[in-house]
Every structure is written in C-alpha cells, then in structure tokens.
Amino acid sequence: NMLKIMLIRHFATPGNEKRQYIGSTDEVLSEKTAFLKRSYPIPEYIIASPMKRCVQTAKRIWGTDLSGCPIVLEPLMRECDFGQFEGKTYEQLKKNAAYIKWLKSGGITAFPGGEDQEEFRKRCVEGMKKQVRFLIARHVKYAAFVVHGGTIMAVMHALYEEKKDFYNWQVENGSGYLVSVSEKEWENGIELLKNAEKRSGR
C-alpha cells in the first residue's frame, strides 16, 4: 500500500517578502496572502510545524473543509534558528565576516548564535519519520505536511530515493512536492520518499 504525502511550504510572511532570514521568529502571514487561493486535495491528516505561519497556511488552504481533518503539530519540523542572521537580508549581511564564512561553507556551518545545520536537518528528518510512522499505523492514504522551506529541503535531501543537492529542493511559498511512501518498505526499515512531483496548487 502507498501513502501519498503533499509537502507544502507555508505562504509568505512580511519577512519573506523583504527577503529576510526568518527562522525562529514566529511571524504571521503577510496581509498580501489574505486572498491567495491554492488548491490541494483535502487530506485525511495535516501535519504542521507549530509556527503560526504554517498553521495559518493550512487554514487558508483548506478553510472550512478542515472540520473532519485533524492538525497534528510537529515541533521537530519547525524552521532553523538563524541566530545572528535572523531577520537580516543578504544586503545587510554581505560584508559580515561570519556570513561570508557561512556562504563559503555552502551553508553547512552553524549560524553564529543559532542552530547547527546538521542538527537542524537531523531533527527535521526525525520529525518526518515519526509522523510517517504515525500515518502508516493509522492506514492513512493521503496526508499533507505544512512546513518550512528549510524543512522540505532537509527531508527531501535525506530521504528521497534519488540523491540530489540540498538546494535543489528549494520551493516557493505555497508550493511543494507530492511524494509516495511504500508502507511495506517503511515497515521493513527502508525509509524512502519516492516519485516526487512538484506542485504549486495553482
């Protein structure tokens, strides 16, 4: 049996519109998203990061259709804490020595005063695996995850059957990937996401 999962990046926040690094800041959605329409099939379960922008996005997408659909919050899938870079833009940081060093590392080193990239990716994957097992145990056929750009990249980079670069999995706000999970394989310890299709809900 296959479980289909739609991974969706939350709608834009004011910080996203200003191209700021927004990670641990619990921003609400931008006013411009109030009339944004994105159409995704109604899931049996929604797994969301507990941050306001993700929970609000789920409510914006499915609205009144959520009555019979539980939203499960998964703190392990919240966005990375950008430390000293939090709330800043590339323009503000481009002369910052720590930022230059971080860029040269390919974005791998820890953010000064923030979260280690490896730790961040590890917790996202842990959260994903935990929730996939939760869904399989309930024989769910279709679920949606409303999370963050960094979370989607971390999960796809680690678990997708075909190895691709971390940044290859970048998606716009409101877009994401539809993936498949083989229940049998997961039950046998082969924890992979398959058949990725990019979706925008437009």
Task: State what each model feature region is.
Residues 40-42, 131-141:
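Glycine-rich phosphate-binding loop signature in dinucleotide/nucleotide-binding domains
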